Amino acid sequence: MRKRISAIIMTLFMVFMSCNNGGPELKSDEVAKSDGTVLDLAKVSKKIKEASAFAASVKEVETLVKSVDELAKAIGKKIKNDGTLEFADADKDKNGSLIAGAFQIILIAEGKLKGLDKEAGISEALKAKVTDAEAKSKAFLAKVKGQTATLGKNDASDDDTKKAIKKDNSDKTKGASELEALNTAVDALLKAAEGEVEAAIKELTAPVKAEKPSQNN
């Protein structure tokens, strides 16, 4: 995000350098391009700031959701002295805490998604994607809560745990299917959010269209 902000600052500087302030009298926050197009830098800068802040919030959600994949890698394993993980019969079918951790992570992600559709300056398309991602997070949480007989205990089996949090498992009937759908929704939301940032920046950097030469002599 720091690199993105630095790029935005540099873009604003380039706009100031490249814009022609001649012609009609401009307000303090306005600059004119060489074709006479007037840019309201205050409005454009606000749009970039809002889009960047929204994208950063979505990135936090994505990081949380993707972290469940890392938890899934620890199913039925223990830590070795060298810091790596290995399967161990003594630790087999003891995944209750692992499932609880994954559940809590998605619960936090759901909380972060709430209210994102109320953020200033975001498009209706983005609002719809936020709503979809939030619905997918609720679906996962509801699915896992409905499986407490097998998942809500200390000795949750490796097989049941994979069905719950391993989204590439062959059997996804205890939550993994909903988790996969949540990942897809969050990926789409992040892509759209980053697209809004790029669009806002492009508003500053879009080249001026060359005027067609007049055919009237």
From Swiss-Prot:
Coiled coil: none annotated. It comes from Borrelia hermsii. It comes from the Bacteria. Residues 151-174 are annotated as: Disordered. GO terms for cellular component: cell outer membrane. This is Variable small protein 22. Residues 1-18 form the signal peptide. A lipid is attached at residue 19 (N-palmitoyl cysteine).
